[in-house]
From Swiss-Prot:
Purpose of the protein: Catalyzes the last two sequential reactions in the de novo biosynthetic pathway for UDP-N-acetylglucosamine (UDP-GlcNAc). The C-terminal domain catalyzes the transfer of acetyl group from acetyl coenzyme A to glucosamine-1-phosphate (GlcN-1-P) to produce N-acetylglucosamine-1-phosphate (GlcNAc-1-P), which is converted into UDP-GlcNAc by the transfer of uridine 5-monophosphate (from uridine 5-triphosphate), a reaction catalyzed by the N-terminal domain.
Cofactor(s) this protein requires: Mg(2+)
Gene3D superfamilies: Hexapeptide repeat proteins, Spore Coat Polysaccharide Biosynthesis Protein SpsA, Chain A
Predominant place of localization: cytoplasm
GO cellular component term of the entry, any: membrane
Native species: Thermobifida fusca (strain YX)
EC class of the enzyme, as a word: transferase
Binding of Mg(2+), residues: D113, N238
Region annotation Linker: where it falls in the sequence: 241-261
Taxonomic placement: Bacteria, Bacillati, Actinomycetota, Actinomycetes, Streptosporangiales
Protein name: Bifunctional protein GlmU
Length: 484
């Protein structure tokens, strides 16, 4: 089935979501790197609607600000008081009219808390709606336990005759497993007319959009329903339990697609990816790996176990284990970890080794260079073929400003070297163990700042008499004298 571009899509996002027990509006809670509302709008965008209207209410400032970053062209409609779904639709229509937009053609109504909704399902809903010539087409779903949901009522021929709420349903109707999702495709002109006929004469004093279905059918218009192929797509999120379940389901969907595209996921139950993550073929994701934001993993790379990468690029055939990296670039065939920390601005070229307990921040490390152990690299430019000795520190902060250190190609630095920036170590230069580099080191030079070793015989026995160390020293001295 093919569908035209809808005249408008309305997204209802005005509710408070009290069951979330949160200061944050429900629709702004996130799963897999995107807000609930963001997931819905991403599905809506696949329809390429002429207009998108988001109905806001509770915490409207926060929701509106969020919309500026994820859907800047969306129109916001204010529902000052939450008086029901029908009232929300009326506010959306008024917002469109304020921009001189009269609804003609198909209008889709969605909810802002259904993050598993697929764009393909919305396209099929619109296609079925237009092919059948319906005034309204309900997006329905078949569920194993329909308790609490409105049921889709059909006649003997299978034609939709209406929606009956659970409380009003007969025993026969309660046995029906096809439920109303609260999402619809409407004829825009008819919706604009019928929405003003909705009544708030009910227990809650609210206007319900479901009443529009009965009114349109009563006027002799055709009503239909399109059954979602996956019932989880229409499940809303109302509390933290449902939020966790939605996250699990979406993560499983994303991982399944990665595996079908040629990625090995060793343990899907402990591996988490965001929707904007990209992973190349033959990459391996080990257990307890989290890929967040816009992380990109190259072909053949191995990531994990116990690794968190956020907005990080990993090159082909790189190996990253037990590592946390944020806004970093890891080059092809590089090796990182275990227990490394790459902070924003860390750039590792091809074949770089970053070893155990190494932190890199706002620095470049050239091709084939190694920082193997217990080192902090901050605000540095390290050339190619360099080896940084264990326990070295790039001292980049003078208490007021940060300064850079430059290490030339093929330099070798001894263990426990301190580079007090700003300082430059030339190509092929060496530093001795324990050196504090405060001045530039010319190419090919050896920098040594430590003085001759001073040994004070008998110091422990005199200054720490009776201690285990002193006793051990006395025994060793006695053995030495016996050997003579």
């Amino acid at each position: 089935m093919s569908a035209s571009r809808p005249a408008a899509v309305m997204v209802l996002a005005a509710g408070e979501g009290t069951r979330m027990k949160s200061r944050r509006p429900k629709v702004l809670h996130e799963i897999c790197g995107r807000s609930l509302l963001g997931h819905v709008l991403a599905a809506v965008a696949e329809l390429e609607p002429q207009r998108t209207v988001v109905v806001v209410g509770h915490a409207r400032e926060q929701v509106t600000e969020h919309l500026k970053s994820i859907a800047p062209h969306a129109i916001t409609a204010l529902q000052e008081e939450q008086k029901g779904t029908g009232h929300a639709v009326r506010m959306a229509i008024e917002a469109l009219r304020a921009q001189n937009v009269e609804l003609t053609g198909t209008v889709v109504l969605t909810c802002g808390d259904t993050p598993l909704l697929r764009g393909a399902t919305l396209r099929d809903l619109v296609a079925a709606h237009e092919a059948e010539g319906n005034a309204v087409t309900i997006l329905s779903a078949r569920v194993p336990d329909p308790t609490g949901y409105g049921r889709i009522v059909r006649d003997a021929a299978g034609a939709v005759t209406g929606i009956v709420e659970h409380a009003d349903a007969t025993e026969e109707q309660r046995a029906v497993d096809e439920i109303n999702s609260g999402m619809y495709a409407f004829d825009g002109a008819l919706l604009s007319q019928v929405v003003h006929r909705l009544s708030a004469d009910n227990a809650k004093g609210e206007e319900y959009i479901t009443d529009a279905v009965a009114l349109l059918r009563g006027d002799g218009h055709r009503v239909g329903a399109y059954i979602a192929p996956d019932r989880t797509e229409v499940e809303g999120v109302n509390d933290r339990v449902q939020l966790a379940e939605a996250r699990r389901l979406l993560n499983a969907r994303l991982l399944e697609q990665l595996m079908r595209d040629g990625v090995t996921v060793v343990d899907p139950a402990s591996t988490w990816v965001d929707v904007d993550v990209r992973v190349g073929r033959d990459a391996v994701l080990e257990p307890q790996t989290q890929l967040q934001g816009r992380t990109v993993i190259g072909e053949g790379a191995q990531v994990g176990p116990a690794t968190v990468l956020c907005d990080t690029e990993v090159g082909e055939d790189a190996v990253v284990s037990h590592t946390v990296a944020r806004e970093a670039v890891i080059g092809p065939e590089a090796t990182v970890g275990p227990y490394a920390y790459l902070r924003p601005g860390a750039r590792l070229d091809r074949g770089v080794k970053i070893g155990t307990f190494v932190e890199v921040k706002n620095s470049t490390v050239g091709e084939g260079s190694k920082v193997p152990h217990l080192t902090y690299v901050g605000d540095a430019d390290i050339g190619k073929g360099v080896n940084i000795g264990a326990s070295s520190v790039f001292v980049n902060y003078d208490g007021v400003n940060k300064h850079r250190t430059v290490i030339g190609d093929y330099a070798r630095t001894g263990s426990d070297t301190m580079f007090v920036a700003p300082v430059r170590v030339g190509d092929g230069a060496y530093t001795g163990a324990g050196t504090v580099v405060r001045e530039d080191v010319p190419p090919g030079a050896l920098a040594v700042s430590a003085g001759p070793q001073r040994t004070i015989e008998g110091w422990v026995e005199r200054k720490r008499p009776g201690t285990p160390a002193a006793q051990a020293a006395e025994r060793a001295r006695a053995r030495s004298e016996e050997d003579r």
